[in-house]
């Protein structure tokens, strides 16, 4: 919208969806979009359906490598309950930082169903002031766009993720002997595995679990805080 001299609307949110092979085909356009940036009242979210065993895709696929190569943050819901809240957070992050945001959904999550209570869902309190000029502008040279992405948008995105506590410490103890960092769906599987061997309250055994919902960019302050508890 900000590329027009006299736009007729304030902003547009866009949601792209595709499986892994579709992401491969679309990477040229996606890379250009992320280098250009979103408008201040817009937002771009890429919902990528990963099929790691090739159940219903032409190839087994993991999307992280492609998204990271384009400088796109990755949100990874652990289950059906997290898809909508994290999707809304992804849109807010995109609008705030001017960056595209990936939403990774694995086949196990996409093929499952659940009753989800959204009555308490509220927009996150950003609580941040915009410090940098991160949104798309007219006639920005290619090298300037790349510099903006890596020196302004990604640091802004990292601060948003940290301040809004998107990554979570699920179970912890002050006497931790073992810290488990689980990414996305592996968080649920880790808890199920501990339950299966009778460890229903990991903290009693000195075990802490950190749910990494944004595997890239990794928020080092979140990891340090978890390890220091």
What are the functions of these language-model segments?
Residues 1-95:
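Thiamine diphosphate
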């Amino acid at each position: 919208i900000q590329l027009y001299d006299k736009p007729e609307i304030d902003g547009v949110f866009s949601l792209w969806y595709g499986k892994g092979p579709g992401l491969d085909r679309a990477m040229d356009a996606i890379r250009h979009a992320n280098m250009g940036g979103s408008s201040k009242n817009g937002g771009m979210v890429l919902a990528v359906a990963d099929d790691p065993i090739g159940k219903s895709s032409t190839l087994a696929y993991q999307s992280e490598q492609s998204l990271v190569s384009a400088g796109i943050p990755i949100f990874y819901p652990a289950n059906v309950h997290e898809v909508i809240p994290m999707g809304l957070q992804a849109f807010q992050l995109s609008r705030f930082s001017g960056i595209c945001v990936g939403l990774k959904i694995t086949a196990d999550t996409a093929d499952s169903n659940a009753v989800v209570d959204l009555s308490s869902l509220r927009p996150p309190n950003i609580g941040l002031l915009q410090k940098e000029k991160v949104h798309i502008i007219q006639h920005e040279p290619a090298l300037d766009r790349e510099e903006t992405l890596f020196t302004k948008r990604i640091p802004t995105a990292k601060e948003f993720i940290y301040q809004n506590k998107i990554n979570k410490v699920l179970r912890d103890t002050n006497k931790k002997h073992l810290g488990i960092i689980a990414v996305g769906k592996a968080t649920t599987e880790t808890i199920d595995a501990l339950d299966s061997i009778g460890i229903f309250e990991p903290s009693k055994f000195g075990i802490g679990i950190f749910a990494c919902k944004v595997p890239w960019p990794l928020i080092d302050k979140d990891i340090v805080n978890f390890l220091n508890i």
